[in-house]
Amino acid sequence: MATKSVNKPDEPVFYPVFTVRWLAVHTLAIPTVFFLGAIAAMQFIQR
């Protein structure tokens, strides 16, 4: 049986904010949102 470190249920688990996963997600997500916004804005440019 795998033993797990037992926490008290009322004690919150500390999750670090800056992780490798967080950096990987945001380095992809931030430019993606920027480009989607730029492409959406281009649709309204009249020539």
From Swiss-Prot:
GO-annotated molecular function: electron transfer activity; heme binding; iron ion binding
Membrane topology category: Single-pass membrane protein
Predominant location: membrane
Keyword field: Electron transport, Heme, Iron, Membrane, Metal-binding, Photosynthesis, Photosystem II, Thylakoid, Transmembrane, Transmembrane helix, Transport
Highest taxon listed in the record's lineage: Bacteria
Cofactor binding annotation: With its partner (PsbE) binds heme. PSII binds additional chlorophylls, carotenoids and specific lipids.
Biological process, per Gene Ontology: photosynthetic electron transport chain
A family per Pfam: Cytochrom_B559
Localization annotation: Cellular thylakoid membrane
InterPro entries documented for this protein: PSII_cyt_b559_bsu (IPR006241), PSII_cyt_b559_CS (IPR006216), PSII_cyt_b559_N (IPR013081)
GO cellular component, one term: photosystem II reaction center
Annotated residues for binding of heme: H26
Disulfide cysteine pairs (residue numbers): none
Bilayer-crossing regions: 22-38
Cofactor: heme b
Quaternary organization: Heterodimer of an alpha subunit and a beta subunit. PSII is composed of 1 copy each of membrane proteins PsbA, PsbB, PsbC, PsbD, PsbE, PsbF, PsbH, PsbI, PsbJ, PsbK, PsbL, PsbM, PsbT, PsbX, PsbY, PsbZ, Psb30/Ycf12, peripheral proteins PsbO, CyanoQ (PsbQ), PsbU, PsbV and a large number of cofactors. It forms dimeric complexes.
Family: Belongs to the PsbE/PsbF family.
NCBIfam families cross-referenced by the UniProt entry: cyt_b559_beta (TIGR01333)
Function (record text): This b-type cytochrome is tightly associated with the reaction center of photosystem II (PSII). PSII is a light-driven water:plastoquinone oxidoreductase that uses light energy to abstract electrons from H(2)O, generating O(2) and a proton gradient subsequently used for ATP formation. It consists of a core antenna complex that captures photons, and an electron transfer chain that converts photonic excitation into a charge separation.
Name of the protein in its database record: Cytochrome b559 subunit beta
Taxonomic source organism: Synechococcus sp. (strain JA-3-3Ab) (Cyanobacteria bacterium Yellowstone A-Prime)
